[in-house]
Amino acid sequence: MEAIRKELSRSYQELNEEAEPVAIDPEEAEDEEKEQEEAASAVAPDRDSDRSSPPVRFSRTCLKNFFSVLLILVYLLLMGVAVFLVYQTITDFRDKLKHPVMSVSYKEVNMYDAPGIALYPGKARLLSCEHHWYDHIPPLKDPGQPGENTCVTQDISYIDPYTNKTMKHALIVQGPRDVRRRELVFLQFHLNETKQDFSAIDYLLFSSYEAFLKSHDQVKFMQDCESSFSSWKFSGGFRTWVKMSLVKTKEEDGSQSVEFRQETSVVNFIDRRETPDKGDQLFFVVFEWKDPYIQEIQDIITANPWSMIALLCSVFLVLFKAADFAKLSVKWMIKVRRRHLKKRARELNHIS
């Protein structure tokens, strides 16, 4: 009897151990439940098997797999487009850095800084220099004879910066300032007994007459001006009207360069003198500001690094999301495939 009791207690203990719960993965438990449901539906009466026949279930599985593959291909296409956008964005940014856009603006002024007018008369002699306003020049009283000189002028001599041998003599005249009142400077020169076939006087313009006066080395200042600015000419026997405009250009290193642009009009001088000498030439020139606007030019880099960073972040986010979705889709397809194989094996076992 005691042996029978020990054997019964041992059997009850084994049954209790088998009845204890085992830790199961939630996904595996869910798969097992689905498999059990599918198995139950497989061994159900013929009515249920008729309603959900194997060809219908197989077509549904194929359709799901087809759409999964299609979604993966779509997201791979989106990933390719995103990679192309990243490449194109970086390329455009580098191209904009190399090729800045020119920006032009206009600054309105009431008074200009008096420009410097450097004239190289040669053998010609200055007869008169006057300031007038409102584009009005009074009639000439006695052309060819010395007249009034109300301009601020200064003579200077320096060595030609190009030849380093020729001595050049320049007459520096303070230019007009009041653009609102249309201030102008009218100069008259006289040249007698010229042996040249053509006669003309050279001149150049620089931005500030005051800067010339304050310069410690005026000779070096004029040599630099002649090296930096272009020179022009006006001919004898005509009145040359020069209308100036100022252009300031900001360089890449932050420095600023100044350039004069001019429009000229030439009017023939009617010589009414009774006995003009042969070879006698009169030169007339007028300097005036064209308008009260200074043109400012600078290069602007249109590439915005913050917009590029934002675009790259959004593209990378799309890439990560697409990769995550593709990963989940592949996992789901593998799970469906395994479930289908298990179900098929169970059906074969059941049939056998």
From Swiss-Prot:
<keyword id="KW-1133">Transmembrane helix</keyword>
<feature type="topological domain" description="Cytoplasmic">
    <location>
        <begin position="321"/>
        <end position="352"/>
    </location>
</feature>
<feature type="transmembrane region" description="Helical">
    <location>
        <begin position="66"/>
        <end position="86"/>
    </location>
</feature>
<feature type="topological domain" description="Extracellular">
    <location>
        <begin position="87"/>
        <end position="299"/>
    </location>
</feature>
<dbReference type="GO" id="GO:0006821">
    <property type="term" value="P:chloride transport"/>
</dbReference>
<keyword id="KW-1003">Cell membrane</keyword>
<keyword id="KW-0407">Ion channel</keyword>
<keyword id="KW-0869">Chloride channel</keyword>
<keyword id="KW-0406">Ion transport</keyword>
<feature type="region of interest" description="Disordered">
    <location>
        <begin position="1"/>
        <end position="55"/>
    </location>
</feature>
<keyword id="KW-0812">Transmembrane</keyword>
<dbReference type="GO" id="GO:0034707">
    <property type="term" value="C:chloride channel complex"/>
</dbReference>
<dbReference type="GO" id="GO:0061797">
    <property type="term" value="F:pH-gated chloride channel activity"/>
</dbReference>
<comment type="similarity">
    <text>Belongs to the proton-activated chloride channel family.</text>
</comment>
<dbReference type="GO" id="GO:0005886">
    <property type="term" value="C:plasma membrane"/>
</dbReference>
<comment type="function">
    <text>Chloride channel gated by pH that facilitates the entry of chloride ions into cells upon exposure to extracellular acidic pH.</text>
</comment>
<feature type="topological domain" description="Cytoplasmic">
    <location>
        <begin position="1"/>
        <end position="65"/>
    </location>
</feature>
<feature type="compositionally biased region" description="Acidic residues">
    <location>
        <begin position="15"/>
        <end position="38"/>
    </location>
</feature>
<keyword id="KW-0868">Chloride</keyword>
<protein>
    <recommendedName>
        <fullName>Proton-activated chloride channel</fullName>
    </recommendedName>
</protein>
<feature type="transmembrane region" description="Helical">
    <location>
        <begin position="300"/>
        <end position="320"/>
    </location>
</feature>
<keyword id="KW-0813">Transport</keyword>
<keyword id="KW-0472">Membrane</keyword>
<dbReference type="InterPro" id="IPR029366">
    <property type="entry name" value="TMEM206"/>
</dbReference>
<dbReference type="Pfam" id="PF15122">
    <property type="entry name" value="TMEM206"/>
</dbReference>
